[in-house]
Amino acid sequence: MLGKLRDLMGLTPETDIYDEEYPQGTARTLTTEPGVEPLPASPPTPTHDFDTRPSPSVATGSVPTGSTASNVIGMPNAGRWWGAVAEVLVMQPRSFSEMPEVIKALKERKSVVLNLTLMEPEQAQRSVDFVAGATFTIDGHQERIGESIFLFTPSCVQVSTQVGGVRPSATPTPTPPSAWGMDAQQHHSA
């Protein structure tokens, strides 16, 4: 009885060695070890490593995960309809170590007002660069709204400023001529 249980569970080594399946009506070669009777031929039953029943997540419109799912990544809060309440998170971090929270909020499609007045200038600059890089990767927007105060928004938020508003436009600083530009001009003139 224990042997039959092992056979059913597939714990015994296979003793049947057979060739590829042939169309019906052609002979098949079947060899077995001595003392072992071959099983009667039966049509193969399909075996699947996955469940073919529809999952509950398909009914809700979300993307299924697992080996049968496509490479599409669901957007958090993508099911929001127009006119839904958008969340704005106001943060006043004291160190750079709090910046991953800002990135997480942006990934959750929340706008973030970042007040960096409590940070050291070097850490504040590093923080702005870090969050600006993450904002760029999600096609978001950034806007300076005050001294050491910045607005970072995901791509689903449109930011507009008033023309002639409170914030003066930045004046471009003249850049020194590049050494590369001088070399290129000298080679063309020769």
Curated annotation (Swiss-Prot):
It is found in: Cytoplasm. GO terms for biological process: division septum assembly; FtsZ-dependent cytokinesis. Residues 15-71, 164-190 are annotated as: Disordered. Its main location: cytoplasm. Pfam families: SepF. Keywords: Cell cycle, Cell division, Cytoplasm, Septation. The keyword Cytoplasm applies. One of its GO terms (cellular component) is cytoplasm. It comes from the Bacteria. Residues 54-71 have a biased composition (Polar residues). Disulfide bonds: none annotated. InterPro entries: Cell_div_SepF (IPR023052), Cell_div_SepF/SepF-rel (IPR007561), SepF-like_sf (IPR038594). PANTHER family: CELL DIVISION PROTEIN SEPF. Cell division protein that is part of the divisome complex and is recruited early to the Z-ring. Probably stimulates Z-ring formation, perhaps through the cross-linking of FtsZ protofilaments. Its function overlaps with FtsA. Homodimer. Interacts with FtsZ. Belongs to the SepF family. This is Cell division protein SepF. The lineage of its organism: Bacteria, Bacillati, Cyanobacteriota, Cyanophyceae, Acaryochloridales.
